[in-house]
């Protein structure tokens, strides 16, 4: 059974994903999948901001583990290892999600879709596969896999995103 969580400041957390035993169950993983994918497809900026606050810990981070080729080449040119790209906190996460929306969803070319339901990996870790699907013909323009670490309130503490090929 999913139960709501209330912080001492009396802010309701109705989207809590952990059960009374602090384990991720099928219902929690389904909810996580739906909310996470909805966030990246959401057209309304205020709704995106609200979803980020519901899904993510205040200091939550997303780490892009395999940055775009031009960034990898620039790092290699100055003898640096390939860098991870990290955004932290609700404001930076909002900017990251908004930019992805503007690039891929707003033009009407793609939509993000889950590749099944998130899977419990270990403890409070979940893995979520997704695809960027063409609205024109249903072809896959790209895929990814996110490893999400949830905090004690069931919000995302960290998200390590691995971008895959189409």
PLM ranges: what are they?
Residues 5-7, 17-166:
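C-terminal and inter-domain tail/linker signature
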Residues 1-3, 11:
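Short hydrophobic transmembrane-like helices used for membrane targeting/insertion
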């Amino acid at each position: 059974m999913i139960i709501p969580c209330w912080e001492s400041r009396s802010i309701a957390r109705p989207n809590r994903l952990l059960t009374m035993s602090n384990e991720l169950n099928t219902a929690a993983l389904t909810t996580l999948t739906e909310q996470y994918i909805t966030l990246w497809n959401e057209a309304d900026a205020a709704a995106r901001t609200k979803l980020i606050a519901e899904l993510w810990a205040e200091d939550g981070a997303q780490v892009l583990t395999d940055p775009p080729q031009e960034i990898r080449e620039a790092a290699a040119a100055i003898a640096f290892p390939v860098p991870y790209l990290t955004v932290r906190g609700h404001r930076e996460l909002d900017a990251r999600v908004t930019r992805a929306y503007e690039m891929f969803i707003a033009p009407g070319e793609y939509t993000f879709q889950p590749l099944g339901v998130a899977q419990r990996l270990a403890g409070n870790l979940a893995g979520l596969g997704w695809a960027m699907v063409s609205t024109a013909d249903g072809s896959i323009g790209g895929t990814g896999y996110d490893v999400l670490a949830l905090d004690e309130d069931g919000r995302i503490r960290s998200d390590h995103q691995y971008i895959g090929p189409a």
